[in-house]
Amino acid sequence: MAQKLEAKGGKGGNQWDDLLDHDNIAKIHVQGGHEGIQYVKFDYVKFDNLKIGQPKLGSIHGLSRKGFTQTFEIDPTSEYIVSVEGYYDESKGIIQALKFKTNKKTSDMIGYDENGLKFSLEVKGKAIIGFHGFADTNLNSLGAYFAPAPPTKFDYQGGSGAQLWDDGSNYNGVRKVSFSLDDTEIRQIRIEYDKSGLVEKREYGSNVGRQEEFVLDYPTEYIIYMEGTCDIVSDTSKNRVRSLMFKTSKGRTSPIFGKVAARKFVFESNGSALIGFHGRAAAAVDAIGAYFSPLILSAPAPPPPPAEKLQAKGGNGGNQWDDLADHDHVTKIYVQGGQEGIQYVKFDYVKNGQPQSGSVHGLLGRGFTQTFEIDPTNEHLVSVEGYYDESKGLVQGLKFKTNKKTSDMIGYDENGLKFSLEVNGKKIIGFHGYAQTYLNSLGAYFVTAPPTKFDYQGGSGAQLWDDGTNYNGVRKISFALDANEIRQIRIDYDKGGLIERREYGGNVGRQEEFVVDYPSEYIIYMEGTCDIVSDASKNRVRSLMFKTSKGRTSPIFGKVAARKFVFESNGSALIGFHGRAAAAVDAIGAYFSRFILPPSAETLQAKGGEGGDPWSDGVFNGVRNIYVGQGENGVSAVKFVYDKDSQVAEGNDHGKPTLLGYEEFKLEYPSEYITTVEGCFDKIFGSGGGVITMLKFKTNKRTSPPFGLETTSNFVLGKEGYKIVGFHGTSSHELHQLGVYVMPI
């Protein structure tokens, strides 16, 4: 939703308003005289569905007469106004001068600023899309409408050969840039991006030469300026990138990476930070471009939610002990057992990278001592199984399970009563309980478990790729296969109910696929083989096979070879791949994350107009926030923020938000929940069969305001005694239909 800054300057004049139904500003006209600014005029542009800009000429605000007239032009395809600076005469109530700043350049001061009072119009991270104010024979005051600013793309500089690559503008920032350099050019660039707190790596070119890097103090530091040179490399006769240098939001300047050449280029966008690269590369970096996005320094991260404490289970008696929950991982477990039961336990932890040795709980005695070690870099404790003697009040046996392995039963479980410590989707970071001469009972502290990364298996050649851990699950895996190897892998991921496809390798050979019944089925096991391919003399992935949470086993894709590998993480599902590929799949690795099958929910059919593509957010525990965006014809987009196991789960945009942005309806979750949705729809010319024009949400406590305009065709979504726990529907650049998932209250 657009933000309106009230008019600033002198008092008086007649009110005028260009409104905010534009997408950008194309040209500014300012006429000045001895008294001050005589008039302003703004020409706008509005983009149609094909992204073709339609000009909209503005009106004159003030009075045109003898004076100097200056213009300031803006390229609406890649440029936008970020701020206005002005001066006014308070006694006369007239603006004396104006200066306009875009993401790429700044105008001259138009008028004069001698002894005037200064004002400014600026909202961090937003662009001006319209103006308003007061004027008579002169301009008295000026205000503006702001909308979220789009990223700025700088075209690549350098040669036009080699392979085109583009990382896009969907990252939050850059954490590190690394290089391979020789005496004449940049052979390789490696970028570590931040995406919602996780690192995603990309690399382009050949890893040949000396290694250098520039590390950012992200998220408090960003790259705000990039300078480079390019020229012909004599031994190849190709125009390539020869040097790069960066400046940051903290005033730091990087070293010059490479050798400075004749042709200089600069990428800089006022008030913006570098969030992505694109270019061309093969044996070296032939060309490079960049994306910049308005810079808003991150607020301090909210504190993590408190650990969940499971009360001690086992026998009665003993003295209370507590290792507390202020650790990051459990690294080693010591258990001493005897004839009566477990004599003592001891846990070693790590906190902020530093080892912490725990205390003995129980009494050291004669007995067998066993240890169980956990690698904190990629392994975590997910559960404990135990047995106790109720009459003696003593724990008799313990078994520990991580995301990768399970210990033996330490002690004995004959005729004992069983207990377990486990919270789905979480890991153990601390223990507590009761003990005296023996261990009487045991409890644990749980926090959300991180994804598990399995390093890629196969060869070390070809192009590195990494899909990361930001997907919800895998819907389908497809392959191109020949007689010896896997030539290509294609993955259909689920992300907020939408499908995102990634593919790596060459699409050569026969086609095979494995479809998962997501979201009720996940891949929980992956097995493969790799070996040297004789005709290429390269170690590559030769076969892959999968098992699912429903007990299904896929066919073997490819030809089984000698070197076997297995990826499996207890209680976890496959959510992402990484590896290396070019003409074939050279190597593959995987990410697994703890999963909880969604509860059984009832689907209520989507209502509204016809048209659009289907989408589904899936089923959650509840709804936290609702965002509704409006356009010319009706509801342009919706977005929902859910609760999933006490964690915030943000859905995707369904439809296309306009520069008006979103209106928000925030629920007092978990005490408040949605019971019904009311809506209207209508057939609108150009909307392809009908669009939803209004939505209104009713909770167990209140009713939201209507978002949009009511029409004669309406609908209600809901079921008595049920609450809404997810949404689905159809959309294009607008919202056509909306349906819901409901569960009993």
Swiss-Prot record:
Family: Belongs to the jacalin lectin family.
Record's protein name: Jacalin-related lectin 4
InterPro entries: Jacalin-like_lectin_dom, Jacalin-like_lectin_dom_plant, Jacalin-like_lectin_dom_sf
Residue ranges of every copy of the Jacalin-type lectin domain listed in the record: 2-148, 151-294, 307-448, 451-594, 601-744
Gene: JAL4
PANTHER family: JACALIN-RELATED LECTIN 11-RELATED (PTHR47293:SF66), JACALIN-RELATED LECTIN 3 (PTHR47293)
SMART domains, A to Z: Jacalin
UniProt keyword terms in alphabetical order: Lectin, Repeat
GO molecular function: carbohydrate binding
Gene3D superfamilies: Jacalin-like lectin domain
CDD domains tied to this protein: Jacalin
Domain of life, source organism: Eukaryota
